[in-house]
């Protein structure tokens, strides 16, 4: 078992590094380009968009949100599928869920190489305005912003101890 220390307002580097490496690798394979990292900004929201959420438990308990504003979701879904997927179509949820699932599987593998054992949940997909989970005060979180094919993508990571995380059980 790896010793992952959770400090107040700080995401462990092994998590952020694995997430950053994963989005670069997976999006390069799927979309043909490495996402451009635009920095961290916890005050920036996605507006009207769709979000794929995966929880991880094990040596570290945390949540990953892969968020796409409406126009980003439509453009990237079309590239991923090879045909247009309307934003309001239920298939959009399947596309975003699959992207989150593929990325999460890659993250689990990368963390395993680092000696960190985690299991992932099935994806939950939500659509709406500035969709984010409510978490207890003091739980570290981080929003990482990227540009892919000229479109915004946001990743939010929320890390905590197992007893602090809501919905942290895989399959929950």
Model-derived features with residue positions:
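N-terminal auxiliary interaction/assembly segments of multi-subunit proteins
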Residues: 1-172
